[in-house]
Amino acid sequence: MDAPVLYAELHLANTQGLRCTSPPSPRQDACWGSGWHRVALKLGCVGLILLLMGLSVLVGFLVQKPPIEKCSVAVQENKTEPTVRSTILECPRDWHLHWNKCLFISQTSRPWAEGLADCSLRGATLLLIGDGKELKLLQDFSKGKGQQFFIGLKYVQEDKVWKWMNGSILNTNLLRITGKNEENSCALISHTEVFSDSCSSDNHWICQKTLKRV
């Protein structure tokens, strides 16, 4: 009877030893894992908030950018507007635009010297003809008016040549003067020709000046 009792006690002791060396409770691991989960969740929320704040700032910047660009365009337009306006050319009142010239047609008839003086008072000179096309247009104009006009061309007896008021000598390939080449001869333009007449005779005249910049 003694042997079985000893066996039972030893078995119990071994069983208790096994219980003492059992692994940690699964509940403790779960608590540990849930703690890290909460920390990660908080960090994720903070990161999401920062991301949303960054996006809001970016959207605000993009929304504000177009007005700035519009303002800059408006400023550039304002800067260029004076430049555009400064290139606009026009003739004074009672003057007529003719290519790149402004022409004034006298309403009275006077000698050539008085016509020259009148043009000078207007800041102009008697008409100078530059080429054949301009000559043709002026002859057509003279025909429409039914008049003849003094121009800025006079015979210089000392040099035996016709000279324009700017000092240049007449190019006979451009136009030919009909009539006498003598002292006190001035040129007139009609609808058919350019001819000489006495500078003392009374005729209408044409003044010219460059276009005015406004």
Curated annotation (Swiss-Prot):
Record-annotated C-type lectin domain positions: 98-208
UniProt keywords, alphabetically: Disulfide bond, Lectin, Membrane, Signal-anchor, Transmembrane, Transmembrane helix
Entry's localization field: Membrane
Cysteine disulfide partners in this protein: 119-207, 186-199
GO CC term, one of those recorded: cell surface
A Pfam match: Lectin_C
Bilayer topology annotation: Single-pass type II membrane protein
One GO molecular-function entry: carbohydrate binding
Entry superkingdom: Eukaryota
Parts of the chain on the Extracellular side: 64-214
Record SMART domains: CLECT (SM00034)
Intervals, Cytoplasmic compartment: 1-42
Annotated TM spans: 43-63
Gene3D superfamilies: Mannose-Binding Protein A, subunit A
CDD domains membership: CLECT_NK_receptors_like
PANTHER family on file: KILLER CELL LECTIN-LIKE RECEPTOR SUBFAMILY B MEMBER 1
Protein name per its UniProtKB record: Killer cell lectin-like receptor subfamily B member 1
Organism: Rattus norvegicus
